């Protein structure tokens, strides 16, 4: 426990002075031919402004107020501040045929890139304008609980909003980012990132509509953000496609408010390396299918993580979303075998099934939850999940009226995806916790309605 407390203090100190500034000229995209009429594709003009700014050593590329700049793919570059003035909108072109660069390299099964960069430094995206991913334009039929996905084989044309690969010194501040068709803000191999004061407003019916994905990245701070997302709001991971960027560590999330149809704050499920030294503090989670989740499904490890001072509200949503209203969920199970469109990237090269790594030294402190289910901690074998601390964790169990009760969700795992626990037995237990092959220290207290 002392070790975890030291990790918390060190992480907070690490980020106190984080910040960058991009100085130089200000270039208005309209001076480079952008029309801003919301109908003409302005990508070429915006790219000309970015290229000119980069050639001159950096500065600000300005999207002026009261214009909508529809655009296809745009490449961001070093020493650029992309600044959106109030009432300016950067809107994704809805034409699927113009998105050709995969967000995951050779794996084309997980969407394309819209606003992107690779191996640059000193990038900032600021202002009180809006970046709009035009998400519904890329969806199929609207269903009761979600949007149907258009049929794909190996190629998924849905664009990710921001794919930022190998960025050293990154700021995203104050902007509104909305309507992602796939992942919204994807940090890959970034070092020194500060996401502060943004509104991230995704459609709650869009599957795979993650908010912020921190992938193989280090020294990241996410603070004072408001996030609504159909899929995970904030997710830490290590995807196999980007293994060259190394582990994910030294991450702070603080003062955020989140709503998700999946998991509000998640670690996993993709994790082929290590995720360590993570602090999530002072957050509020509302109306989510799962509150806090560690979902380890690959050979990587998750260690030294602190969740503290969190209020959360979980309720049962449709099974198209992973989760069964678990306020706290800590698991390590081998990934399911299957015929997913990117199945060749799910396991180590040349293998047809995978393993799952250790999850250890995870602390939950000062958590208050209202939920339609209890907490779940489990692993595929004894010793895989251990050192899980509960201190001052309180769960108010609310009996759901319409959905099936007393089921925990292990997806995507090999074998049965659901664990059935009798609801009457659950509420008769002195704690709101169900465990499987796991070692916990302390237990969540509970009341029931």
Q: What positions do the PLM features span?
A:
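Positively charged n-region of N-terminal signal peptides that target proteins for export
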Residues: 1-6
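Bacterial N-terminal signal peptides
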Residues: 8-19
């Amino acid at each position: 426990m002392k070790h975890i407390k030291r990790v918390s203090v060190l992480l907070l100190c690490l980020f106190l002075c984080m910040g960058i500034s991009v100085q130089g000229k200000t270039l208005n995209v309209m001076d480079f031919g952008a029309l801003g009429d919301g109908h003409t594709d302005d990508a070429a003009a915006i790219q000309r402004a970015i290229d000119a700014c980069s050639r001159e050593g950096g500065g600000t590329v300005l999207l002026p107020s009261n214009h909508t700049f529809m655009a296809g793919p745009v490449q961001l570059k070093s020493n650029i501040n992309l600044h959106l003035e109030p009432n300016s909108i950067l809107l994704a072109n809805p034409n699927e045929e113009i998105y050709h660069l995969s967000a995951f390299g050779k794996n084309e099964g997980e969407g394309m890139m819209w606003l992107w960069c690779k191996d640059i430094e000193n990038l900032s995206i600021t202002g009180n304008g809006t970046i709009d991913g035009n998400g519904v334009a890329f969806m199929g039929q609207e269903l009761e609980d979600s949007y149907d996905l258009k049929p794909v084989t190996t190629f998924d044309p849905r664009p990710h909003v921001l794919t930022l690969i190998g960025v050293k010194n990154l700021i995203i501040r104050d902007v509104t980012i909305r309507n992602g068709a796939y992942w919204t803000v994807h940090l890959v191999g970034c070092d020194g990132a500060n996401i502060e004061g943004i509104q991230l407003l995704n459609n709650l019916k869009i599957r795979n509509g993650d908010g912020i994905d921190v992938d193989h990245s280090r020294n990241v701070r996410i603070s004072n953000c408001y996030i609504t997302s159909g899929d995970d709001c904030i997710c830490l991971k290590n995807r196999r496609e980007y293994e060259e960027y190394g582990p994910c560590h030294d991450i702070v999330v603080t003062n955020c408010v989140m709503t998700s149809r999946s998991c509000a704050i998640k670690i996993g499920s993709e994790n082929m390396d290590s995720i360590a030294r993570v602090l999530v503090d002072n957050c509020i989670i509302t109306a989510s299918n799962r509150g806090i989740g560690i979902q380890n499904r690959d050979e990587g490890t998750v260690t030294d993580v602190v969740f503290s001072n969190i209020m959360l509200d979980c309720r049962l949503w449709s099974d198209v979303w992973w989760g069964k209203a678990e306020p706290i969920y800590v698991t390590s199970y081998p990934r399911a075998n299957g015929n997913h469109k990117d199945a060749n990237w799910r396991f180590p090269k040349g293998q047809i099934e995978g393993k799952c790594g250790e999850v250890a030294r995870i602390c939950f402190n000062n958590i208050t939850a209202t939920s339609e289910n209890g907490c779940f901690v489990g692993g595929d074998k004894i010793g895989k999940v251990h050192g899980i601390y509960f201190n001052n964790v309180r769960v108010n169990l609310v009996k759901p009226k319409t959905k099936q009760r007393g089921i925990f969700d292990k997806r995507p795992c090999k074998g049965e995806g659901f664990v059935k626990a009798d609801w009457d037995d659950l509420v008769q237990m002195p704690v709101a916790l169900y465990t499987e092959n796991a070692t916990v220290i302390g237990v969540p207290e509970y009341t029931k309605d």
